[in-house]
UniProtKB/Swiss-Prot annotation:
Its EC number is 2.5.1.145. Keywords: Cell inner membrane, Cell membrane, Membrane, Transferase, Transmembrane, Transmembrane helix. One of its GO terms (biological process) is lipoprotein biosynthetic process. This is Phosphatidylglycerol--prolipoprotein diacylglyceryl transferase. Pathway: Protein modification; lipoprotein biosynthesis (diacylglyceryl transfer). GO terms for molecular function: phosphatidylglycerol-prolipoprotein diacylglyceryl transferase activity. It is an enzyme of class 2 (transferase). It comes from Dechloromonas aromatica (strain RCB). The chain crosses the membrane at residues 17-37, 56-76, 88-108, 176-196, 236-256. Catalyzes the transfer of the diacylglyceryl group from phosphatidylglycerol to the sulfhydryl group of the N-terminal cysteine of a prolipoprotein, the first step in the formation of mature lipoproteins. The keyword Chloroplast does not apply.
Amino acid sequence: MLLHPQFDPVAFSVGPLSVRWYGLMYLVAFVQFIFLGRYRIKTRPGFLSVEQLDDLLFYGMLGVILGGRLGQVLFYEPAYFLANPLEIFAVWKGGMSFHGGFLGVLVAMGLWTRKHHLNWFEVMDFVAPLVPLGLAAGRVGNFINGELWGRVADASLPWAMIFPQSGDMQPRHPSQLYHVGLEGLALFVILWWFTAKPRPRAAASGAFLIGYGAFRFITEYFREPDHGIFGQSYTISMGQWLSLPMILIGVAMVVFAYRKKSL
């Protein structure tokens, strides 16, 4: 059984400015997006320019941050933020919903593709394999903060971990690291392999929805359930409710993409 290391949430300070690990992980996510995106541009010459990729990242950042925070407020902690409205703006403290951020990115990509007169699905297919490692970085930030810990685990589990922030000092699943392994590393490998060959339009986007939704549904069984807008449930969590439509829509997109290709 392990004890959570209890990292200082501040990675480093420069004068009065403190840089937190959680914010630093977002920076890592954005940097890897640019690095992998530029590599993919070379494999698809003429599709996007480096300048367009940088602009795409800017729109994506706005979508992630605004959508992620609003998703946290609306899906998971509406009562808390209603009582403490100024906390909505304290994004450096953590508290970002993936599903809210995902919806924010969809809107941002819609605006960006309209601005550049590009097909929305083709851009989303390009972006899909660039996302998982960024998600992994965010989950590493959750682990460093000692938040979003897992459900109580058997003390005999070698990697069971005590998170002092939970208040009960019981051994728990380090579910943040499960997210890193499945929704981050595994999904990245799958999508990078899947997009190595030309695929029908919307197939890669659909594969992302299926992969993320399925992996998130699995990892939620090891994560301490959030209360969410429907209250706390040990049968199916808010994250699982939000992942189900992702899986269904993803399957429909992949089926439609390949059927359209065969017509």
